[in-house]
Structure formats: C-alpha cells, structure tokens
C-alpha cells in the first residue's frame, strides 16, 4: 500500500471499527442494528440542533460523520470514500485531506441542523460529498481531461452513489448538496492559492 493512501485507509478502518463497536454494544436487537442502524454509540454520536446547539454537545458535529445506519449505508460510503479520498489525498497530501474531510463534515452537519432543527444526522457522506465537490473542481479544471483519472467502473459507481442518495429523503439530499457546495468552494480556493503560488 502506498503511503499517499494511508490516511484514507486508516480513516475507513476507524469508521468500520466504530460500526463494529456500535453493533457489539447493542442498545437494541444487534441484528437489526447491523442491518438498519441504531444503538448506543449512534445515540451518543448523532448530531441534532437540540443536542448540539442547545445543549452544547459540539463533538457531535464530528462524531456524526463516523456513524452509519446499517451495514449497507456503511459499505456504500466506504466504497465512495476509497475512490474519492485516495485521489484527494494524492493531490493534497494526507494531512490536508483529513482536515478538509473532518472540518467539512462539521460544517455540513452544522448547516444541516440549521435547516432541519427537529431532525438528526449521521453518515460519512457528510464529509465525502465535500471531498467529491472539491475533486470535481480539480478534475474539471483540466478541461475535463482529469476525468480520465477515474476508471469507467469508478465513474459509474460515483454516478450511482449520487443518484442513490436522492432516493433516501430530502434530509439526505440537502446534506449531500451542502457538502458538495462546500467542497466546490474549497476546490476553487485551493486552485486559486496554487495559481497565486506559481505567479508570486
């Protein structure tokens, strides 16, 4: 395994371990927690307007990005993280990728809670869509030629990943859209700084 992929790999391992711990600790029928979510860890890690903005449990803006509603939610997000995260890590390095993912997750969760004050949110897609938006800017900044960096399978899966999220409710759609827009803005900012560095 190449060093440039280690941050994405270890972050995925951490997310999977959180899922396993959540299932093991229970908080309900473990089989259904495995399939559809729930559990003690989810209850202590999800983000909502009331828990974070009213009760001051700010860590939830970060922990919510490491929790999932069942194994299918987990697998879908980890496949996307591997494809997107590794490429962002190659372009920016492991530290910047991790910072952008985690801060992006927190900002996306914060804005989501403002839009849906009665709801709660979890899922790595909060940060993944930030990385996706940023990666799209970087790839299209090459006149579209950057898309060749993705295999046909990867392009197909990412299209499926985006479309599938649209069938999971308005909350998911809004969360993905917020993250994607944040990622686009970050991508343009990085390109601008890169250009200034070359001309400065």
Spans of features found by a protein language model:
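A detector for small-residue-rich transmembrane helices and their helix-helix packing motifs
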Residues: 1-200
